[in-house]
Amino acid sequence: MSFQCGIVGLPNVGKSTLFNALTESGIPAENYPFCTIEPHIGIVELPDVRLKDLARIYSPEKVTPATVEFIDIAGLVKGASKGEGLGNQFLGQIRQTSAILHVVRCFDDKNITHVDGSIDPVRDVETIETELLLADIMTLEKRKQKVEKLARSGDKEAKDSLYILDLLLEHCSDGKAARLLTIDEDYNEFKRSLHLLTEKPVLYIANTSEAETMEDDTGEHVRSLEEYALKENNIVISLCSSIEQEIALLKEEEKPIFLQEYGLSEPGLNKVIRTSFELLGLQNFFTCGEKEVKSWTISKGSTAPQAAGNIHSDFERGFIKADTFHYSELIKNGSEKALKELGLIRQEGKDYIVKDGDCIFFKFNV
């Protein structure tokens, strides 16, 4: 399973710098709007100490981490929903993503222009949210026109769809994101099928100054963003994208010293990647052996056969059982042999719900 996180925000807020840090690439990060026209795509490893621990125990020929795909989407501006600043193209790119990382400028720098002339994180967030909402309203109105004809003919499914469309239109017209509308479980599949921009989960990235990072002090700009995010139960991660880019370009042995200088326990990007994972309700299980130790990504709540299907469809189709133990038990006891002697390797069936950190050996027959 793979998923994409779209990095969005106004022009000149640090999106491309953040992307460079995430992917350790060197795309332009110039001080003018629309520096990024075509979206830049990067695949990033999920930071996971468990994989290193498993590799130490199994000494495999190959270690394969889980990955996250990030897309650097050009800066949105007011009027994007009407096509301003190549808005239609950029909104279409956001529609293809699984989650949104919204980069918000929370630093003052006279050398870097702001499209609105001043620093106001809440105003900036609302500018983007408004454009996404307007685009969603247009999507809903177009869909409603198509469904109304069928509903008038007595089609029950169309009537149900029309009911949900009206609920969403009223909700979005009130300036509320589609993800905040709770509806009956029976209608969630239809809601998801609309691919609304404001249905996507959002993580706010407060891009702060180097001074704020060194002082470990939350400034007024970050505090205002946190208060705004709290209203929607959203998360804010504070980091300085320019520092993160410097860290990303260092050799591994140099990173701890640099982090210590800034009083950081780890790169802020590690938290961004992990939180993006959690935002989408994803988790990992592992397959372990002498040839390969690999991390696999599944949705929380997945059954053992569904997890097996991520490896190969035959594994799901011919699933028999799953020999399972948890990563923590392996670390505690030191070896798979010790787990067997203690009776800690379980045989799970088709109804087993896979837990984050499970190590699984699937048995199947096709």
Which functions belong to the PLM regions below?
Residues M1-T113, V122, E141-K142, V147:
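Conserved G1/Walker A P-loop phosphate-binding module
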Residues E24-S25, R50-L51, G75-V77, R105-N111, ...:
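Conserved nucleotide-binding/hydrolysis micro-motifs of P-loop NTPases
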Residues E24, R56, G92, T130, ...:
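Short, intrinsically disordered, mixed-charge
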Residues L76-K82, G117, R123-L132, A151-E157, ...:
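Flexible beta-alpha connector loops of hexameric P-loop NTPases
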Residues T36, Q89, L132, T139, ...:
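Alpha-helical initiation/capping and key positions within long helical/coiled-coil segments
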Residues S2-V8, V13, F19, K146-I353, ...:
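C-terminal-of-GTPase-core extension/linker across diverse P-loop GTPases
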